[in-house]
């Protein structure tokens, strides 16, 4: 079983002229050094299919809900400035699941928007929350793309690139 250590959520502005067949390819930024990353998949609602003839209630799976993700993480000026300047814009998001920081267990991609707010300032640490709205159906893209990450001396990403396989 894999752990979530080094899972990351990355983003970029939606390209004005995406490349046919390799939409998700390009350079991304780390959204926030996250403490946890919620699922972009909402729960599936159930549709009641019970009739007066049925002895028990019956249901079928309906649509999944797509809402928002509250991603709490480290409050860093450079990340805060980037997120504030991207507020209200359509963005491409990818969640890199796995322990290598490159999506070894899976890469989930979707289009959405984000906003940032600082959390309560305490004597312990300073955090902020990025609220990400999921506006398209998330899709798994790890079979089609590779991820290259350049990191600084502390292991924090300085450049994240997705390329078509």
Sequence positions of predicted segments:
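Viral virion structural and adsorption modules
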Residues: 1-4, 133, 137-165
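Surface-exposed, hydrophilic segments of mature proteins
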Residues: 16-22, 103-109, 163
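Acidic glycine-/aspartate-rich tracts in secreted/extracellular proteins
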Residues: 17, 76-78, 137
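Structured, beta-strand-rich domain cores
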Residues: 57-102
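Short beta-strand and beta-hairpin "edge-sheet" elements
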Residues: 96-143
